Amino acid sequence: MNLQEIKNIATSEELIDRALRRASKVEEKVRNPDYRARLTAVRKIHSVADNLANPMISYVKAFPSFDSIHPFDREIIDLTVGVDMLKKSLGAIDWARKEILMISTKYVPRARARQSAETTMKIMSEAYTKMTNVVRQISKSFDFLISARSIFRNLPNVDTDSPIA
């Protein structure tokens, strides 16, 4: 296991900004304005959810599984950042990912429903707000993972598989 190879982790605000910026570029080219609004809203909700959830799962997978790592590595993690705090932060990020996907699946059918463009945009805005609030709720977990990553990058790389002769 190499703790130095953990990829860069974005802050919660950077993640939100990136997701909303990418979603703003999504548009449908349909003549009927109500239908266009529904299609665009659905695609934008999916875009925001994907651009928030996909980096989160990669952050969780970037850190080692504590059940399968060498006891020495586990002790190093525990002494530097604390295994319990790291597990808590990773768990919070995984919870937020699941919550965002659940919000997306809840709001997409509502955005698809036959209604005016104005109502559809309100539903889309509500979905955006809920998803970004979930990410902001766990901003301290992102900050902790960023600091843990910087601490891990400064640690020496010790090969625990080869014998010390």
PLM segments and residue spans:
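N-terminal accessory targeting/assembly segments
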Residues: 1-96
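Intrinsic-disorder/low-complexity, polar/charged segments
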Residues: 11, 113-119, 157-159
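Charged, amphipathic alpha-helical linker segments immediately N-terminal to NTP-binding catalytic cores
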Residues: 90-149
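Pre-Walker A adenine-sensing motif
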Residues: 147-160
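Glycine-rich phosphate-binding P-loop
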Residues: 162-165
